[in-house]
């Protein structure tokens, strides 16, 4: 009369047979949470990369602006001489 029952197997079988929809919902919630976390992480990485690019562009802007101003002044001088 001394039978050994595997309690974890009994609980697992009961959960599958009686609480199938609840287990599916819990699994879907878990997957949804993981996807949200990965999307937020990737979005933050992209945002930080975009900010770094903006900083680099701002550092290069005065150089480009100076080149533009000097070339436009030269063009203006040439136009003055031509007329």
Swiss-Prot record:
InterPro entries: Cell_div_FtsL (IPR011922). One of its GO terms (cellular component) is plasma membrane. Keywords: Cell cycle, Cell division, Cell membrane, Membrane, Transmembrane, Transmembrane helix. Residues 42-83 are extracellular. The chain crosses the membrane at residues 21-41. It is found in: Cell membrane. It is a single-pass type II membrane protein. Residues 1-20 are cytoplasmic. Coiled coil: none annotated. One of its GO terms (biological process) is cell division. Essential cell division protein. Belongs to the FtsL family. This is Cell division protein FtsL. It comes from Buchnera aphidicola subsp. Baizongia pistaciae (strain Bp). The lineage of its organism: Bacteria, Pseudomonadati, Pseudomonadota, Gammaproteobacteria, Enterobacterales. The gene is ftsL.
């Amino acid at each position: 009369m001394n039978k050994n029952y595997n309690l974890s197997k009994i609980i697992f079988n009961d959960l599958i047979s009686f609480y199938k929809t609840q287990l599916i919902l819990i699994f879907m919630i878990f997957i949804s949470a993981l996807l949200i976390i990965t999307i937020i992480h990737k979005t933050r990485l992209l945002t930080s990369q975009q900010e770094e690019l903006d900083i680099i562009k701002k550092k290069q802007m005065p150089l480009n602006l100076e080149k533009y101003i000097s070339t436009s002044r030269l063009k203006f001088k040439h136009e003055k001489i031509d007329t």
